[in-house]
Swiss-Prot record:
Protein name according to UniProt: Aldehyde dehydrogenase 1A1
Protein's organism: Rattus norvegicus (Rat)
Site residues by UniProt (Transition state stabilizer): 170
Modification type N6-acetyllysine: residues: 91, 128, 252, 353, 367, 410, 419, 435, 495
Binding site for NAD(+): 167-170, 193-196, 226-227, 246-247, 269-271, 349-353, 400-402
A GO-annotated cellular component: cytosol
Record key words, sorted: Acetylation, Cell projection, Cytoplasm, Lipid metabolism, NAD, Oxidoreductase, Phosphoprotein
EC number: 1.2.1.19, 1.2.1.28, 1.2.1.3, 1.2.1.36
Claim: Metal-binding is one of the keywords in the record: no
Tissue: Strongly expressed in kidney, lung, testis, intestine, stomach, and trachea, but weakly in the liver.
Entries under InterPro entries matching the protein: Ald_DH/histidinol_DH, Ald_DH_C, Ald_DH_CS_CYS, Ald_DH_CS_GLU, Ald_DH_N, Aldehyde_DH_dom
Gene name, Swiss-Prot/TrEMBL: Aldh1a1
Region of interest called Mediates interaction with PRMT3, as start-end residue ranges on this chain: 336-501
Length: 501
């Protein structure tokens, strides 16, 4: 059976006007307590799009207070039927579909995303994920347990409470939905901090949340910086859980703050240096295409990027040649322009970090096959770059680059490549390309990664749990397991006069 047809991609919205730039608390728009604002840039032009209210600890305190009030026993949210929560989430998904063109245009302008990708993948994936979570709202069940003695025992899955949610800049809207969807489905309230680089789609979503009919205080959105607003959420004594997607370095700080405060629950989806293993029997054209997509999609700004390509010795040269040909086909430019394959990196800091790592690859002896520098005179663009003859000890083989840079390494045996693939502090994703079923199962079982793709790469769906091993994070998002991350499991044991089977 063929996949459902994708919707036609319209032209981006012309003359975009940003309507929402304030802090959203209790279904109302607020200025920051400090009176500060911060600029939001278009990374393709380096121009300021608008200025947004800069939330900090005082604003987070207000948002948490509103979220706590909305979570009180007897509140409209706590007494709402679970099926009604699902209806509200479906209504929100419908409003996203209505505003799909607007949201995709904002993602492209604010986040540097190729517009077609934003419209099809980011919006399509966000809407599907929200509808998936909506369907779970009245299907989160406890159990009855046949315990010993004259005792009737059952379990309840209850919402945790006030959840702080810190969103990354690489997939601002998709990660916003991955966070709020499960949390709201289970009956929690949330305080969301979008990334300071990309707050605009989250703030538009705030207007849709109010329009959909969510009670005041259920969703609160505080734009601001990590060291101020993010730290305030992580260390807040009245936040019951924090979820974060971003770098491992910041994830460590969040987990430390959670432990030092009230030992709040923590879900972390962090960095990666994901291996992609291509055996000689693989369909090489398919492997080249998926490996290319796996590292160059969204300018390489993906936590699951296939940033270590291991290719069996006998097909190595052909794989490199085909990969270079594929990378050279890329067209760079303004992501709103039709026919563009690659937009800019998110900001100057990321842009300069990528160029520094590329220089390290040159100095350490990797062979630069194509790219290797800045592109254009304006915007944070990096040329699609391919390195061959990469060895495991090079910086480009060990550090997360988060840019359009492909490292291709050679291997001789299955035992060798498994050992090398696992020789990293990360464990988020991996890919295996082979026609041998036994080999595919053996290697996928041996790889230390939260998701392993076989003969494909970067295939994500709302039905499947996603998360990392080792320093790539804790917990899971999406799927049934992702829902349960937003519940506490309570056992209730009742003394009765007589128990009967």
């Amino acid at each position: 059976m063929s996949s459902p047809a994708q919707p036609a991609v319209p032209a981006p919205l012309a003359n975009l006007k940003i309507q929402h730039t304030k802090i959203f608390i209790n279904n109302e728009w607020h200025d920051s307590v400090s009176g500060k604002k911060f600029p939001v840039l278009n990374p393709a032009t380096e121009e300021v799009i608008c200025h947004v209210e800069e939330g900090d600890k005082a604003d987070v305190d207000k948002a948490v207070k509103a979220a706590r009030q909305a979570f009180q026993i007897g509140s409209p949210w706590r007494t709402m039927d679970a099926s009604e929560r699902g209806r509200l989430l479906n209504k929100l998904a419908d409003l996203m579909e209505r505003d799909r063109l607007l949201l995709a245009t904002i993602e492209a302008i604010n986040g540097g995303k190729v517009f077609a990708n934003a419209y099809l993948s980011d919006l399509g994936g966000s809407i599907k994920a929200l509808k998936y979570c909506a369907g779970w709202a009245d299907k989160i069940h406890g159990q009855t347990i046949p315990s010993d003695g004259d005792i009737f025992t059952f379990t309840r899955r209850e919402p945790i409470g006030v959840c702080g949610q810190i969103i990354p800049w690489n997939f601002p809207l998709l990660m916003f939905i991955w966070k709020i969807g499960p949390a709201l489905s289970c009956g929690n309230t949330v305080v969301v901090k979008p990334a300071e680089q990309t707050p605009l789609t989250a703030l538009h979503m705030a207007s849709l949340i109010k329009e959909a009919g969510f009670p005041p205080g259920v969703v609160n959105i505080v734009p601001g910086y990590g060291p101020t607003a993010g730290a305030a959420i992580s260390s807040h004594m009245d936040v019951d859980k924090v979820a974060f997607t971003g770098s491992t370095q910041v994830g460590k700080l969040i987990k430390e703050a959670a432990g030092k405060s009230n030992l709040k629950r923590v879900t972390l989806e962090l960095g990666g240096k994901s291996p992609c293993i291509v055996f000689a029997d693989a369909d090489l054209d398919i492997a080249v295409e998926f490996a290319h997509h796996g590292v160059f999609y969204h300018q390489g700004q993906c936590c699951v990027a296939a940033s270590r390509i291991f290719v069996e010795e006998s097909v190595y040269d052909e794989f490199v040649r085909k990969s270079v040909e594929r990378a050279k086909k890329y067209v760079l430019g303004n992501p709103l322009t039709q026919g563009i394959n690659q937009g800019p990196q998110i900001d100057k800091e990321q842009h300069d970090k990528i160029l520094d790592l590329i220089e390290s690859g040159k100095k350490e002896g990797a062979k630069l096959e194509c790219g290797g520098g800045r592109w254009g005179n304006k915007g944070f663009f990096v040329q699609p770059t391919v390195f061959s003859n990469v060895t495991d000890e090079m910086r480009i083989a060990k550090e997360e680059i988060f840019g359009p840079v492909q490292q291709i390494m050679k291997f001789k045996s299955i035992d060798d490549v498994i050992k090398r693939a696992n020789n990293t502090t990360y464990g988020l994703a991996a890919g295996v390309f082979t026609k041998d079923l036994d080999r595919a199962i053996t290697v996928s079982s041996a790889l230390q990664a939260g998701v392993v793709w076989v003969n494909c790469y970067m295939i994500l769906s709302a039905q499947c749990p996603f998360g990392g091993f080792k320093m790539s994070g804790n917990g899971r998002e999406l799927g049934e397991h992702g829902l349960y991350e937003y519940t506490e499991l309570k056992t209730v044991a009742m003394k009765i006069s007589q128990k009967n089977s």
